[in-house]
Amino acid sequence: MRPIRILAQPDDSTCGPTALHAVYAAFGLDLPLEQVIDEVHFLEDGGTLAVFLGIHALKEGFNVRIHTYNLRVFDPSWDGLPMEQLRRKLLAQTKFKTSKKLHSTCLAYSKFIKEGGEVRFDDPSPALLQSYFDRDLPVLTGLSATYLYKSKREYSGSMGESIYDDLRGKPMG
């Protein structure tokens, strides 16, 4: 398997771009971490999405496939649709749903597909992961830091600091 060296992420919201930077380096693309962080789109409330990382990778000339299990954005009946039809579904959905984050995510996936990205709905399995590892391809996966570190959910205090609170907090990272 291709060795991947990942730098320490500069702050709590840059794990995605930091991981993407490591993948770039493993494939010989030498970009400063700060540049990747500056160029990847971030959500208003911090952090990024796989699709924003994918758009950046497409712009850098990579082939990008996202396996999604996000039922807030994708309906299971969309599995197997041609990419252009999936793109139209994402855009049509924005007319019926009011969430600003969902709207932004749908538009980003539409752009991702238009720029040549592929969205798949394959069931997560060891065999799926192994199919990438057998081809010496890295896999980036989104995982909440709250889950990863088994920490309490958190919210931001008046000074922007993280306050851990299992009742009032939200998953972070």
For the regions a language model picked out, list residue spans one by one.
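Active-site-adjacent substructure of cysteine-protease-like catalytic cores
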Residues: 39, 86-94, 99-173
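Short secondary-structure transition/capping segments
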Residues: 76-83, 153-154
